[in-house]
Amino acid sequence: MVPAVNPPTTSHHVAVIGAGAAGLVAARELRREGHSVVVFERGNQIGGVWAYTPNVEPDPLSIDPTRPVIHSSLYSSLRTIIPRECMGFTDFPFSTGPENKSRDPRRHPGHIEVLAYLKDFARKFKMDEMIRFETEVVRAEPAAENPKKWRVESRNSGDISDEIYDAVVVCNGHYTEPRHALIPGIDSCPGKQIHSHNYRIPDQFKDQLNSGSSVSGVDISRDIVNVTKEVHISSRSTKPETYEKLSGYDNLWLHSNIETVREDGSVVFKNGKTVYADTIMHCTGYKYYFPFLDTKGEVTVEDNRVGPLYKHVFPPALSPGLSFIGLPWQVILFPMFELQSKWVAAVLAGRFYSKLEASCIPKRYTHLMAELDSQFVYDNWLADQCDYPRIEKWREQMFYKVFKRIQSQSSTYKDDWDDDHLIAEAYEDFVKFPSNYPSSLIEREYTS
């Protein structure tokens, strides 16, 4: 997908909130359209959630609203669920090369490699000159003197800045503010409780129970299983009678949903089984959270639905001055970020603008692309709006293949695959682009 040269368009002064993958590609696409861009990043480096830290929050459940917030939810051994070939931006392949000896060459690399890729991307497109590091947006709202413009208040080392922008693009991610399941009796549990947001390494666990059976929840369970006596996974998506030992492990069980937690530390499942847990880890996902955003009620978050939004991006009453990148989940994230960003940049420039409509989709799963096909319908719609090539067929098929492998070989899918023909197709496309890795690699140690 070689990007086209865009004709002269209207230029705007745009604030991008967040310098993770979404914020980086949004800034690039906005600048390509001729906009003036400032990226606000509260951390001291790019990467967003991919910037790993061993630090955790003092409140292990992350409930206390006054707690110091740790942005990243990565654990030390995390590897990508999606293969690198289909994970990268369309014109900046997440490939490997023989010259990159210190890099992680695995198809499902660790988080260090993803951050290195994003740093390469930022270096390639000279992103640092647009980013204000250690600068937190504390308030963004329509300007009182001109509601079509946006007032952005930011803080850096105690200094407050107040600026006016033509538009705000929200790219702050949604893997920082934990969600918690409503479990009867959970408040009386005498054992330790932790949300997976604060999980880093397995050494601290003994008898462990995980509430939540998403792919990441199961991966964490496998990370813990070798250092703990037993791990029991609770899943609300299984049948009530579910009770099975997971293949390849003698101490890892899958249960149905939790019925109740008792004061003696016992946990009763819907299947009738009872276990005693030293620790309950809540692998229950995250909330959409925009504490800095004041839209005077035009955009709300209710039951984990951000709305009303047109195509997950523009709130009709505030478009095109306010937009969101990256809300859908269970998708191939980076290419979707890229296509959404192209659309936002083009709409702000006065190209491809279509009338925005309020969404009437049921709330909780508004941003879930539950049907595997739905994300590609959406991505291709975005591509069509921008006169950009549609998502490659090999990328679609690779995504389908990995989800089949997750279901059939969940413990080995990251290291055992049968889609070499798709890898070959991907690398045939990748040769259209210059190497995405600079000659001098990022200076850091990589431990596989």
Swiss-Prot record:
NADP(+) binds at G212, S213, S214, V215, S216, G217. Keywords: FAD, Flavoprotein, Monooxygenase, NADP, Oxidoreductase. Its cofactor is FAD. FAD binds at G18, A19, G20, A21, A22, G23. One of its GO terms (molecular function) is flavin adenine dinucleotide binding. InterPro entries: FAD/NAD-bd_sf (IPR036188), Flavin_mOase (IPR000960), Flavin_mOase-like (IPR020946), FMO-like (IPR050346). The keyword Oxidoreductase applies. Its EC number is 1.8.-.-. It comes from the Eukaryota. Catalyzes the conversion of methylthioalkyl glucosinolates of any chain length into methylsulfinylalkyl glucosinolates. PANTHER family: DIMETHYLANILINE MONOOXYGENASE (PTHR23023). Belongs to the FMO family. This is Putative flavin-containing monooxygenase FMO GS-OX-like 10. It comes from Arabidopsis thaliana (Mouse-ear cress).
